[in-house]
Amino acid sequence: MRAWCDYVRKNQKQRFQTYRQVCGCPYTSVGGELATQDKKVRLETQALIDRFVKYLSGAIADAITDGSAAPGDPQTKAKLVHAFVVGLLLRAKIYNDLKILSHLETGLFALIGAKIPKGPAK
């Protein structure tokens, strides 16, 4: 999970260096704007979100199984994590401030009931 947080920050930083703007999540930006206007876009955005939540759910289930995350429903936790991350990316985009993404790990690990591991991300 820490490596994924690092990936998100690195990806946003690279885009910022190119466009001089925090870009946020392209799927939810486009999906959020067009979902009420275009059913195909809405359905595709839903599919992307569902795929990502499924990935997160599996990672969270593994963390629960190995005792590094608190017991609970991995699917629910994954949906909460997704909503948190999308919200943080949107906030960073609105404020054009990458520092907002420094809270990614703290919030994510709190939502799944886990401690942030010491040392570098794996």
What are these model-derived regions, one by one?
Residues V85:
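Cytochrome P450 catalytic-core helices
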Residues M1-C23, A78-V81, K122:
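Hydrophobic alpha-helical connector segments
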Residues T18-K40:
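Amphipathic alpha-helical segments used for helix-helix packing
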Residues K40-L43, P71, K99-I100:
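Structural helix-adjacent loops and short alpha-helical linkers that scaffold large soluble proteins
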Residues Y7-Q14, D50-S68, Q75, R91-K122:
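C-terminal peripheral helix-coil segments that are non-catalytic and often amphipathic
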